[in-house]
Amino acid sequence: MKKRQALLIGGRYRRPLAGVSAYIDAWGTFLCSSMGGCWRDDEVWDLSSWTVDDIRAAIKSARDNFYTMVIFAGHGEVRKDQYGFLRTYAWLNDDVAMSEHELNPGSERATLIMDCCRKVQLQLINESMEKYALDELVLNGVDTRKVYENELDMCETGFVKVYAADIGQSATDDESFSRTLIEGLRDAYVHGNMGRVVNIRDAVNLAGRILPPQQTPVYNGGRRLKHYPFAINPLVYE
């Protein structure tokens, strides 16, 4: 069986960052929904309360997965690493930051999403996740998990990265990248503006059209012909 795994990491600080836990919960709900590809509960790990050493071990152990997603929400910054390369760093807590290089699980297919927000207006999006009940009403037996895995099979291997904002930008106070990415896509589905399978590149581009112009999300997928799936539209059949 092809093993997939999602590692969710919410930054934990002495002064908690409003909204982080809600966004991590929302990612879990989205991934396990029909639209998110029907991930199983045991494939989605919330590492937010884990020690830094345990988080590092979990990322390392994901190396042999068929597909891994690492999703971080919290404080972040861009600075040069020891070799002089600009890297985005995720602050796991007030004292420890991990670079995007360290967050790479090394599995043959992997996606890193860094929702590095400095201030977030608290808006518990998990309350709106009731809307995903729509999935179960319209699926009529369509196996979106299988559709998702078929899409992964057709993709080239490699590590892709998604950033909530471009270098020099910060996430806005009024918008959350996670919220925009998930809810914006669902609304586009309902209004018939997207096809059956939406890949990560197109999902990020959609979020970029919704977010204010001061915040430009970035997708770094390298030179690939086919991008990893992000969502399956339960309203479209083939």
Residue ranges and their predicted role:
Residues 1-238:
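Cysteine endopeptidase catalytic domains of the caspase/legumain-like
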